[in-house]
Amino acid sequence: MSRIGKYPVEVPKGVTVTLNGQDLAVKGPKGELKLTLVDDVTVEQGESGLKVAPREDTQRARAMWGLSRTLVKNIVTGVTDGFTKTLEINGVGYRAAIQGKNLQLNLGFSHDVLYPIPEGIDIKCTKPTEIVITGIDKQKVGQVAAEIRGYRGPEPYKGKGVKYAGEYIFRKEGKKK
């Protein structure tokens, strides 16, 4: 039995859930998200919320059970609260700024890096060295954060680069004479 999948997903007030076969549409105060579930699981709407269950007792169905429940919970949380990722920029002269629909990053290259902000994602630069990414789709928020971090990931000697807030960077000692 799945330790994650056996619990129902609570649906808060103000959120409407539409089930159409394997298609799930969730509408809330922040927007609307759609999800197509795999054929190995079923979703039922009850008093306690959305209940995800495997269709049959196969290994794939059990594997998809917990995953599907988590995906359903993520879209319900996304349309009610949304998701946020914070990036920190460390390094002399490294900074970020919003320019229209682009995020401009100065990361020590000979040129500025322009990152086009995708639809459904909101990016704010609270400080020149801090980027806050918000949105209703958890996967999209994480993907955007990973792409921005990928331009100049933190290096292990001085810690320069773009890192997630709260991320621990394994440090190395420099050369010795």
From Swiss-Prot:
**Gene Ontology BP terms:** cytoplasmic translation
What functional role does this protein have? This protein binds to the 23S rRNA, and is important in its secondary structure. It is located near the subunit interface in the base of the L7/L12 stalk, and near the tRNA binding site of the peptidyltransferase center.
Cited HAMAP family:
Ribosomal_uL6_B
Q: Which GO terms describe its molecular function?
A: rRNA binding; structural constituent of ribosome
Gene3D superfamilies listed in its UniProt record = Ribosomal protein L6, alpha-beta domain (3.90.930.12)
Write down a Pfam family by its short name. Ribosomal_L6
GO CC field: cytosolic large ribosomal subunit
The portions of this protein that span the membrane are: none
Q: Which family does it belong to?
A: Belongs to the universal ribosomal protein uL6 family.
Key word tRNA processing present in the record? no
Give the organism, scientific name: Parvibaculum lavamentivorans (strain DS-1 / DSM 13023 / NCIMB 13966)
* Transport in keyword set: no
- Name of this protein: Large ribosomal subunit protein uL6
Task: Provide the assembly information.
Answer: Part of the 50S ribosomal subunit.
Q: Which UniProt keywords apply?
A: Ribonucleoprotein, Ribosomal protein, RNA-binding, rRNA-binding
What InterPro entries does the database record attribute to this sequence?
A: Ribosomal_uL6-like, Ribosomal_uL6-like_a/b-dom_sf, Ribosomal_uL6_a/b-dom, Ribosomal_uL6_bac-type, Ribosomal_uL6_CS
**PROSITE patterns on file:** RIBOSOMAL_L6_1
